């Protein structure tokens, strides 16, 4: 079977990271997996490479696509992406990466192709292994802590209850945006994702 694209959700493996800000990409791919035609785990060693990833086959807007969660740590994510793209002949321009973005507030997202990595180790790894920055990025905002020295701990902290509800909405918005992209093109998808605003859950008094 030929696949039109690879959707990559970035995160860290392990239950202790499941609800952390750095794992919004995993959350989005888990949401995608709920509509997947099939789900299977594949090991890099089957391709002669050490490491693991989860791989999903699904249909978006009539297109066969793959989605993956690299089960290495964030800074090695590119190994999974390069291995899958090599096996299934997917070009870097057909890779879509969903990741956390410090420079956007929680509840906002941006869709773009190429550009800088803003210090994101997962994006840097993908660019290094694929040899190009020209992949799509769905940047999901998590906000930024007050001081730069707090970033490392901040991204590994769990979302609070309100943020977790917003993250679920952002995951669904990313899925809708990808469907729009494959159905109507990049412009329509960009307009939707860049203007998306979540319904803020009510907080207890």
From Swiss-Prot:
Q: Where in the cell is it found?
A: Cytoplasm
The record's catalysed reaction(s) read: an N-acyl-L-alpha-aminoacyl-tRNA + H2O = an N-acyl-L-amino acid + a tRNA + H(+)
Listed GO CC annotations: cytoplasm
Give the GO molecular function terms. peptidyl-tRNA hydrolase activity; tRNA binding
Q: Name one Pfam family in it.
A: Pept_tRNA_hydro
UniProt-annotated catalytic positions: 22 (proton acceptor)
Instruction: Name the major location.
Output: cytoplasm
User: Which major enzyme category is it?
Assistant: hydrolase
The record describes the protein's role as: Hydrolyzes ribosome-free peptidyl-tRNAs (with 1 or more amino acids incorporated), which drop off the ribosome during protein synthesis, or as a result of ribosome stalling.
Question: NCBIfam families recorded for this chain?
Answer: pth
What does the subunit comment say? Monomer.
Q: What protein name is recorded for this chain?
A: Peptidyl-tRNA hydrolase
Gene expressing this chain: pth
